[in-house]
């Protein structure tokens, strides 16, 4: 068995970024030296870079003078990593300078140098026995919760903000935005009431939802993350080569391979590695592997496709060559038309126009459309964000909620060229088609899209 990487009709160049890693007052770390260890120093560096660059931008874009984020112990919060903590009252104030003032009340942080003000950093927590509070510092639970807000009113009054963003959802449907944690609606009713009481009537009236600010902050990236994205992408590319190299036609099943492994037959029936009776790959099959690599700081993923040569074949048959051409043309359309500053929804509309102008049928569903023109190859898009938080927005896709399409694509947006090609093969019969899927990594810069690590290089030919 050998793999022939011959079907490379054209492959877009990938760009290796030369990125600075300097944070004033902090020890800097080369991400390439710490990937196996999940370096705490690198975590702190990423956190400080976001505080220095992303935080001022998103607060001013959303016209928020002060951002108060209440994080209660024992409650998952999407900003645990971003703030370096799992408890506290975090207050970020725009005082008209380049650097946003950062303060925390009644909480602890992993990197004290990241904050200007730390008030009561060590708060004694209740004692639990079998899940029941047996000893409560300061009295009953209400007293303890209220204690966390001591000093907040005076702190806020001294800064006199006009608009105070707080972590509760107001207009957006966010339940499906993250697999692991609530996104912007992490504030309990009790803490909301305690916060308003602590602020007093004057400043309580200035409170607004920080939902858009939080989403923009989670979507923001810094150069250190882009470098990790690149390095994990290279690791993923090696993993794909390894898995495709295992395939022996007629012997290897989908479940023998690592990653998200699947195949669709000419009727669109999908087979998965997790099937009770895993499919055994045969000559003439086309299949896909999606793989990934990462740590708690960042992650990357990549997809690859392969064709198993039939007996007597020495190269890909015409239909395989044609579906790869369609994939490359679609990739070039994405590269040429995704830019920062436009919303994901506006970008989706533009891509649909370009795809259809190129002679393809845009399909909003990842299933072959039997009612479409049988002479047109069908393209489906789910170009979503990739990163650490689980946030998939901004999302250039018909899938998901409207707010995911309403988000503006920021500079250094990390995302995946996830798109699918359904190419009809009339010679095989009505509705028969070939399916391939892509999951290339990409970054939006001020100058357009770059590919930080090699994309799918071509349909691998396996004999």
Place the predicted regions along the sequence by residue.
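Bacterial N-terminal signal peptides
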Residues: 8-22
């Amino acid at each position: 068995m050998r793999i022939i990487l011959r079907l490379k009709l054209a492959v877009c160049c990938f760009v290796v970024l030369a990125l600075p890693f300097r944070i004033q007052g902090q020890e800097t770390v080369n991400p390439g030296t710490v990937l196996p260890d999940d370096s705490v120093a690198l975590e702190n560096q990423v956190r400080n870079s976001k505080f220095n660059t992303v935080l001022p931008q998103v607060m001013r874009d959303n016209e928020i003078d002060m951002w108060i984020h209440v994080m209660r112990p024992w409650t998952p919060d999407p900003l645990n990593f971003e703030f370096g903590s799992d408890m506290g009252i975090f207050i970020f104030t725009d005082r008209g300078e380049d650097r946003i003032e950062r303060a925390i009340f009644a909480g602890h942080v992993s990197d004290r140098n990241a904050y200007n003000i730390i008030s009561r950093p060590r708060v004694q927590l209740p004692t639990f026995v079998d899940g029941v509070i047996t000893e409560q510092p300061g009295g009953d639970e209400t007293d303890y919760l209220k204690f966390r807000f001591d000093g907040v009113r005076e702190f806020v009054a001294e800064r006199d903000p006009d608009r105070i963003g707080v972590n509760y959802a107001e207009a957006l449907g966010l339940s499906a935005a993250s697999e692991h944690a609530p996104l912007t609606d992490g504030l309990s009713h009790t803490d909301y009431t305690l916060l308003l009481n602590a602020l007093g009537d004057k400043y309580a009236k200035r409170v607004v939802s920080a939902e858009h600010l939080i989403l923009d902050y989670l979507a923001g990236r810094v150069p250190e993350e882009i470098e990790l994205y690149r390095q994990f992408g290279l690791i993923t590319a090696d993993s794909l080569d390894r898995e495709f190299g295992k395939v022996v036609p007629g012997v290897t099943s989908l479940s023998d391979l690592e990653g998200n492994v699947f195949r669709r037959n000419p009727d669109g029936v999908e087979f998965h590695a997790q099937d009770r009776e895993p499919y055994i790959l045969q000559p003439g099959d086309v299949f896909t592997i999606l793989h990934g690599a990462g740590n708690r700081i960042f992650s990357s993923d990549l997809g690859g496709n392969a064709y198993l040569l039939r007996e007597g074949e020495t190269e890909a048959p015409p239909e395989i060559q044609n579906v790869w051409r369609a994939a490359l043309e679609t990739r070039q359309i994405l590269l040429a038309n995704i830019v920062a500053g436009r919303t994901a929804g506006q970008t989706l509309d533009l891509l649909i126009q370009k795809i259809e102008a190129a002679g393809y049928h845009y399909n909003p569903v990842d299933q072959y459309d039997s009612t479409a023109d049988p002479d047109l190859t069908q393209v489906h898009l789910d170009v979503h964000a990739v990163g650490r938080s689980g946030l998939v927005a901004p999302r250039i896709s018909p899938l998901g909620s409207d707010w995911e399409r309403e988000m503006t694509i920021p500079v250094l947006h990390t995302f995946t060229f996830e798109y699918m090609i359904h190419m009809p093969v009339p010679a095989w019969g009505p509705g028969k088609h070939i399916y391939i899927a892509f999951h290339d990594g990409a970054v939006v810069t001020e100058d357009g899209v770059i590919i930080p690590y090699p994309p799918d290089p071509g349909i691998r030919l396996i004999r």
